[in-house]
């Protein structure tokens, strides 16, 4: 009985924490203060499994972001840091709402799945899609590259969520060309801080999403080379060769170098001969063949 009473008291205490955080959010307390209040409830099993718990800090972040949008429009921002602080709210807002979404589905007494907050969460994502793109661009321009990487990543992830496809269909910012170029920009942000694996992943995602400009292959190859990822460099060069091999011999050079380093002379000859067949008037190809 004592144990049962103790568990009940703990659950009651955690619910009180949630209510305190809700009250602080409604009073317009700083987001960091709301998070500080509710943090114990986010790790307690009695409350962490409830979507309502995660909604509190998520909503607080979005609400404060929206309020700052109005301040920005009224030219109340004093410096760049004000913009950075505003943009930085969007990342935890998304993360908390995703936590809420993950635990929002419950099974009712009839055995049917039921949600409480999902619609609000998804509607909020739709309404803030463009904000994530702008935040990424602003944070990048302020040289907050790690944070720009996160904001760009959230923008991309939102456009790929099946639940949002219909709602975003009429939003020009969700067009494939915008999304794929954002993935490229995300890669550039990672490259700026030498997060080479993340940069390569973003560049490859850009290609997957339809961004096939020459620069994405060139950046991806440069990053792969800097990271010492020769197999990745070889793979990217193979993808770029059919598209841009005629205007730039670096791709066939990388391919043949890969084979030569592993003493695979047959495939090195095969690769350059195929390139010559595709573009017999390219004198650089014969130079490469002569080197082989």
Task: Label each region the model flagged.
Residues 27-28, 64, 87, 142, ...:
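Structural motif corresponding to the intra-repeat A-B loop/turn of tetratricopeptide repeats
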Residues 24, 61, 139, 183, ...:
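Residue at a conserved register position within TPR or TPR-like alpha-solenoid repeats
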């Amino acid at each position: 009985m004592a144990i049962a009473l103790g568990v009940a008291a703990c659950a009651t205490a955690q619910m009180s924490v949630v209510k305190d955080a809700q009250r602080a959010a409604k009073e317009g307390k700083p987001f960091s203060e709301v998070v500080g209040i509710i943090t114990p409830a986010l790790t307690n099993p009695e409350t962490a499994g409830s979507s309502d718990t995660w909604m509190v800090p998520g909503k607080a972040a979005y609400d404060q972001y929206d309020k700052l949008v109005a301040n920005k429009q009224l030219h109340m921002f004093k410096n760049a840091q004000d913009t950075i602080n505003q943009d930085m709210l969007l990342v935890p807002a998304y993360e908390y709402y995703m936590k809420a979404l993950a635990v929002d589905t419950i099974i009712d007494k009839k055995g049917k799945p039921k949600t409480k907050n999902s619609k609000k969460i998804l509607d909020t994502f739709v309404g803030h899609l463009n904000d994530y793109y702008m935040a990424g661009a602003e944070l990048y321009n302020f040289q907050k590259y790690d944070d720009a990487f996160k904001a760009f990543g959230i923008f991309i992830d939102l456009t790929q969520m099946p639940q949002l496809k219909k709602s975003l269909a009429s939003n020009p910012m969700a067009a494939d060309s915008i999304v794929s170029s954002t993935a490229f920009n995300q890669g550039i942000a990672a490259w700026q801080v030498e997060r080479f694996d993340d940069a390569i992943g973003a560049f490859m995602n850009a290609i997957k999403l339809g961004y096939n400009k020459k620069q994405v292959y060139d950046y991806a190859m440069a990053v792969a080379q800097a990271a010492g990822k020769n197999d990745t460099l070889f793979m990217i060069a193979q993808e770029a060769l059919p598209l841009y091999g005629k205007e730039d011999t670096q791709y066939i050079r990388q391919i043949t170098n890969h084979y030569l380093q592993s003493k695979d002379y047959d495939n090195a000859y095969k690769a350059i001969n195929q390139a010559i067949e595709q573009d017999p008037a390219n004198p650089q190809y014969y130079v490469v063949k002569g080197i082989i």
